[in-house]
Amino acid sequence: MDLPGPIHDIFLVFLGSGLILGGLGVVLLTNPVYSAFSLGLVLVCISLFHIPSNSYFVAAAQLLIYVGAINVLIVFAVMFMNGSEYYNYFHLWTVGDGVTSLICTSILFSLIKTILDTSWYGIIWTTRSNQIIEQDLISNVQQIGIHLSTDFYLPFELISIILLVALVGAIAMARQE
């Protein structure tokens, strides 16, 4: 998708704000069903980030796999939980929540510092894939595999971390019976 500069920037700002709002919804909403729907918004926004870079197959695959299967499974699992027991034992703030918030905030800021200090263009897997594809000796499936393991390595790692955190949160909520 070849968009003009301002439209491309507006599209990325829209997706980024959707990611931030969805992430805040996952964490801050007390109703687990609404939290699961916010996770769906986050996964949709992450998959739509692949469209400006002309990787429509990756975007469609992420929509089908993560939103279409995983998030629906999480929504059904959350709906089968007994909601009244969850809300009876809900405490506003505990010491463990404060310690967890402090640890997560420090990890977040260390990740932000690491991401900002890293020279992403000097990493070998971002420049090597173009040399391989220029040979024209490989099929489309091999090109997708090369792009997934080189250019789109970071987005897939990020989505796997988000999915892992969501599943751990769903298990933690289910165990609070």
Curated annotation (Swiss-Prot):
It is a multi-pass membrane protein. Disulfide bonds: none annotated. It catalyses: a plastoquinone + NADH + (n+1) H(+)(in) = a plastoquinol + NAD(+) + n H(+)(out); a plastoquinone + NADPH + (n+1) H(+)(in) = a plastoquinol + NADP(+) + n H(+)(out). It is found in: Plastid, Chloroplast thylakoid membrane. The keyword NAD applies. Keywords: Chloroplast, Membrane, NAD, NADP, Plastid, Plastoquinone, Quinone, Thylakoid, Translocase, Transmembrane, Transmembrane helix, Transport. Its EC number is 7.1.1.-. GO terms for molecular function: NADH dehydrogenase (ubiquinone) activity; quinone binding. The chain crosses the membrane at residues 10-30, 32-52, 61-81, 92-112, 152-172. InterPro entries: NAD(P)H-Q_Oxidoreduct_6 (IPR050290), NADH_UbQ/plastoQ_OxRdtase_su6 (IPR001457), Nuo/plastoQ_OxRdtase_6_NuoJ (IPR042106). One of its GO terms (cellular component) is chloroplast thylakoid membrane. PANTHER family: NAD(P)H-QUINONE OXIDOREDUCTASE SUBUNIT 6, CHLOROPLASTIC (PTHR48479:SF1). NDH shuttles electrons from NAD(P)H:plastoquinone, via FMN and iron-sulfur (Fe-S) centers, to quinones in the photosynthetic chain and possibly in a chloroplast respiratory chain. The immediate electron acceptor for the enzyme in this species is believed to be plastoquinone. Couples the redox reaction to proton translocation, and thus conserves the redox energy in a proton gradient. NDH is composed of at least 16 different subunits, 5 of which are encoded in the nucleus. Belongs to the complex I subunit 6 family. This is NAD(P)H-quinone oxidoreductase subunit 6, chloroplastic. The lineage of its organism: Eukaryota, Viridiplantae, Streptophyta, Embryophyta, Tracheophyta. The gene is ndhG.
